[in-house]
Amino acid sequence: MSFPKELERVLEITKAQNVWRRTQTLNLIASENVMSPLAESVYMSDFMSRYAEGKPYKRYYQGTKYTDEIETLAMDLMNEITNSKDCDLRPTSGTIANAAVFRVLAEPGDKALIAPVQAGAHVSHTKFGTLGALGIQHIEMPFDEENINVDVDKAIKMIEEVKPKFVVLGGSLYLFPHPTKELAPHVHAVGAKLVYDAAHVYGLIEGKVWSSPLKEGADIMTVSTHKTFPGPQGGAIFSDGSEVFKQVSRTIFPWFVSNHHLHRLPATAVTAIEMKYFGESYANQITRNSKALAEALAERGFKVIGENLGYTKSHQVAVDVRQFGGGNKIAKLLEDANIIVNKNLLPYDKPENVSDPSGLRIGVQEMTRYGMKESEMEEIAELFKKVIIDKKDINEVKKEVIDMRKNFLEVKYTFDDMKDLEKYSSKSLKLII
């Protein structure tokens, strides 16, 4: 029997996606990454067909003995690389992790302080997302546009006046660390909790190029496991022994998650092991690359945000492209050349301009994992110039992009072969392999 046409089309689309995004494009979306072949090999397993409601060894289903083992191992590994005491991997995304934390910390009608939306706050922090769905009132903290950060003095005054149930730091446009240690004492002084959304920078935290929020006074930290931490899509919650974590952990199931997509667990564990051995070098190269790309773009005439601060300390670069037609137009133009970025609000944009903002948000973490370094950032900046400023033929630039990718198809910062696995032999690795 021949394949049904519908099935053929499904296979064609999947193959086309794999060829396009894995071999022909410069993937510069700040919220994406790529797993290693090793992590992908354990992602596709029987775990994806199974259920395991509840916590390890306290399940509501039978047949979970290996689920309990891999979940416990994965949490232990994540705590080890994070230097934390508590980890819960059941949230299926960073937004679900935020929802669980927010729901425990506040009731409908309560107040929470966040960074301004146009200055990088994630939609889940706002009335348009999770906070709004939970009936929690969000109030934006004062923002220092020059320093691209929360205004510490004004924020302290607001905390003292508003007395919120919690304060959220972290964001989705996130160039420089928010003032955790500066605000934490004042948050706690009014009886509030400090929540740090590290979805974008978790890989930089465990890679030790970004300060640990938990060590600077955050009560709880939420993360995504697929941005600068290059694992499977999912979320996690960490703490350093806080009572808040215990409360949140008790409510993840059944309030926000039933089954928690068990095939994520072995892939997360493998990625944690990779980051244990390669995470610091990976994170360091990410930050070198982002700075190199920012400088190269600025040298070619682009208005890169944060010049007075060195442009960036994260994996991200933000560029104002209003003079070329705005973020929406330019993001689409770059996609035509196989350069994948996203349009983004900049700190001086109005929230209602979200569909056509001033800026582009660029992330270097995925192409760094494919082995690109500072010299390639120069090449990428030149490709941007050819498309946006020089207005070169898009198809010609697209060919250059495809040729460039031919040399960067192999995932780095992982174990290359079984000899590497033997070299770094450990009890944890033997359990996975």
UniProtKB/Swiss-Prot annotation:
It comes from Saccharolobus islandicus (strain L.S.2.15 / Lassen #1) (Sulfolobus islandicus). Pathway: Amino-acid biosynthesis; glycine biosynthesis; glycine from L-serine: step 1/1. Its EC number is 2.1.2.-. This is Serine hydroxymethyltransferase. Keywords: Amino-acid biosynthesis, Cytoplasm, One-carbon metabolism, Pyridoxal phosphate, Transferase. Belongs to the SHMT family. One of its GO terms (cellular component) is cytoplasm. It comes from the Archaea. GO terms for molecular function: glycine hydroxymethyltransferase activity; pyridoxal phosphate binding. HAMAP family: SHMT (MF_00051). Catalyzes the reversible interconversion of serine and glycine with a modified folate serving as the one-carbon carrier. Also exhibits a pteridine-independent aldolase activity toward beta-hydroxyamino acids, producing glycine and aldehydes, via a retro-aldol mechanism. Its cofactor is pyridoxal 5'-phosphate.
